């Protein structure tokens, strides 16, 4: 691992400690809460759509979300570690066999639907256990930093 990769990994870990990023992939429906500044006021705006691509790696990683707004397709690219992103929430998991879902741009209505990935009870239990473990690790890390 070279120096740049090491620095990027440290920075990413620091940013993840502040705001955890859920595991999601193309095909998943996500809600991205974006901080929008209007004059002096800052508010949070929800942007819900299907993740159609994930690009890059490390600190430069980004993802593209597509939604239909008033009958018009709208796509927005979000850097994963952007300070303008308040939170990311996965609404449903999609079952797709491609990394880039750009073909959805040409489809309308039912043709643009993505089948939902069904989760087995064992996988769900494993995910919940991992979530609890991550929460406990974050709590321990916070307690350790407070003790210093």
Swiss-Prot record:
Alphabetical UniProt keywords: Ribonucleoprotein, Ribosomal protein
Keyword Ribosomal protein among record annotations: yes
Alphabetized GO MF terms: structural constituent of ribosome
GO cellular component annotations of the record: cytosolic large ribosomal subunit
Disulfide bonds: none
Classification via PROSITE patterns: RIBOSOMAL_L19
InterPro entries on file: Ribosomal_bL19, Ribosomal_bL19_CS, Ribosomal_bL19_sf, Translation_prot_SH3-like_sf
A Gene Ontology BP annotation from the UniProt entry: translation
Coiled-coil regions listed: none
Function: This protein is located at the 30S-50S ribosomal subunit interface and may play a role in the structure and function of the aminoacyl-tRNA binding site.
Family of this protein: Belongs to the bacterial ribosomal protein bL19 family.
UniProt xrefs under PANTHER family: LARGE RIBOSOMAL SUBUNIT PROTEIN BL19M, RIBOSOMAL PROTEIN L19
Protein's recorded name: Large ribosomal subunit protein bL19
Organism: Beijerinckia indica subsp. indica (strain ATCC 9039 / DSM 1715 / NCIMB 8712)
UniProt gene name: rplS
């Amino acid at each position: 691992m070279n120096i740049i990769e090491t620095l990027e990994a440290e920075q990413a870990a620091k940013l993840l400690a502040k705001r955890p990023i859920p595991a999601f992939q193309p095909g998943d429906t996500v809600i991205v809460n974006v901080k929008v500044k209007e004059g002096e006021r800052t508010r949070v705006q929800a942007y819900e759509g299907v993740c159609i691509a994930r690009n890059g790696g490390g600190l430069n990683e980004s993802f593209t979300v597509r939604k239909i707004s008033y009958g018009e397709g709208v796509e927005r690219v979000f850097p994963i570690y952007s300070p303008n992103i308040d939170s990311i929430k996965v609404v449903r998991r999609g079952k797709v066999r491609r990394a880039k879902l750009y073909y959805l741009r040409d489809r309308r209505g039912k043709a643009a639907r993505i089948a939902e990935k069904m989760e087995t009870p064992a996988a769900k239990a494993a995910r919940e256990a991992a979530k609890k473990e991550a929460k406990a690790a974050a709590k321990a890390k916070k307690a350790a930093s407070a003790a210093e």
